[in-house]
Amino acid sequence: MSGVAGVGKSTVLEIVSKGTQYDVVNYGTLMFEMARELSLVQNRDELRKLSVDTQINLQKKASGAIGKMDNVIIDTHMAIKSPKGYLPGLPEWVVRELRVSMFFLLEASSKLIWERRKKDPTRVRDKDTEEEIEEHQSVNRYYAVAYSVFTGATVNFITNIEGMPDIAANKIIMELKKE
């Protein structure tokens, strides 16, 4: 499960988790915990500021740990916007470890996401414009399709309507029940 920051992943995934037998594992949180143990970062938002090599090493460690788990939904990012450009959130060596069967990409209007980010004092977010958010959502779509080609996993695009996360969650639950 993926989507840009502020799209509502955590809210939707909380509903999905309650309605299924799946546990939710946050890939970024696992990477953060590993990076913090190494004294590389103090907060989660610093992860994307690390060198690309460091991020790749953390991705490998986290994917190895998650790959050993069963019946999990991974809360992650298809593309990570870094100072040097977009970094694949699920490069080949990661998806191989994870054994992905479905990709869900949660989306919303860039204006709505921009407004949500402004209201969230709990995170240190980049000051992206609506256009940059839209670009990031497009890049996420490209990456999702590329990952699907490599894994054979299906891709599902889910719209998170403001104030109605149950609708998005129920679409995901229905797809998971088909598996």
Regions found by a protein language model. Name each.
Residues 18-25:
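Post-Walker A helix-loop "phosphate-sensing" segment adjacent to the P-loop in P-loop NTPases
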